[in-house]
Amino acid sequence: MKVKKWTLVGIVGVFLSGCTCKPVEHTCRIGAEEGDATQRIQQAIDAAFTAGGGTVRLGAGTHAVKSLRVRSRVTLYLEKGAMILGSRNPEDYFILDSDRIEPVSPSLITHEAWTIEQSCTLDNFTKYPASRWNNGLIRLLGATDAAIIGEPGSVIDGHDPYDPVGEEFYRGPQGISAINCTNLTLCGYTIRNTGNWAHRIADSRNVRAEKVTGLAGHDGFHINGCDQVRILGCTFKTGDDCIAGFDNTDVVVRDCFLNTACSGFRFAGTDVLIEKCTLRGPGEYGFRGALSKEDKIAGAPSGRAKRNNMLSFFTYYADGTHPIRRPAAKIRIVDCTSHGTDRYFHYNYGNEKWQRGQPLADISFIRVTATGLKLPLSAWGDPALPLSLTFKDCRLGFERPQKELIRGAHLGTVWIDNLEVRGVDGPLIRLWNEKAGTPQVSASGLKGVSAEVVPSSDVWSVRGI
């Protein structure tokens, strides 16, 4: 029987990073050198995988790569001062096409370009693990017990690649693209300037991200079809949504700081707890879609983008790009604070393309405080599944006067236990489509707004996010 050992270098590195220790069998350290480091690093990863598992350590300095595949039981470990620098050429990222260690079936490969018509449907390139859209600076496919760990001061830099046939005709590869993985650990590093999402994780189980920082680029952490996910003590300052995804079960987001030019959360799932998080707007980094074509091609910094307002604290998300296994329900937002978001809650089911999948059953806000809001809460539910909305021990304050706190339709129950509102001169709810039914309101300890439900004769008009 082979006995697992602790290597001294492995113990020291894990201690410095603050991440959970793992026994390692094989350790290889790679120093920074001039030129393309892809082959040297990938060969070390493959050797560790072939040996049954191990750690590949990158020393301080710049490691320029095209794309890397991290495999089962392998830890990619970045020492302090180490930087993985991605290629700006999107054609450099098709590594799964020629993988001889773990070959990928041709049926899972496509180089199809992005199209507007397919952007929200299942019948598109997102379902192919080895698609152009799923390409990433670091790839994981079907990996078990894999990890990417960085000491403080380590960086994964996507280099703002431009792809003229990528999403929205400019977005490049993802930062870390992980599909069908189990027991995935992400810890300690800073990831920035990715061509698309910093983390694209799909159909995976037991995912843990801790003390990760995401800067600029697009979505910070985007998960679909994942179970048992923990996002702890992370910082995301992004030009797109900080934490996004749907069809996720048993998700905990705790002690995170979020800053964005889009939504702090564009999310859905079952048994979701968002706890002790802080959101601040406007975004430090602008939305890259607002850059000129010339700036996108040149890889200009995200700070040049003209729009940086934070659109919402929580926007519901469910489109047709991924099968939805369970009802979206039991979402709890607890002990969170925010300042400077346009909206606090945005649910506009069926009226915009990112909210035409499965409807939301219920969401609860408990001991939350929001200041500097600019627009009422949006809550347009599904006639077949009216929304249940709960506020307990909450405070909501608006930057300028509003005519109502909530505008919406197809609401089932609104349950309030201590809610203080500032900046609203009007009812609790302004209701559209009154003939479809009036919500049942139970309000105790409501301050700053009347517990009224007032019908509206106006045309429903809420700008999509």
List the predicted regions and their residue ranges.
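Bacterial N-terminal signal peptides that target proteins for export
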Residues: 1-8
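Extracellular/periplasmic carbohydrate-active domains that bind, remodel
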Residues: 19-465
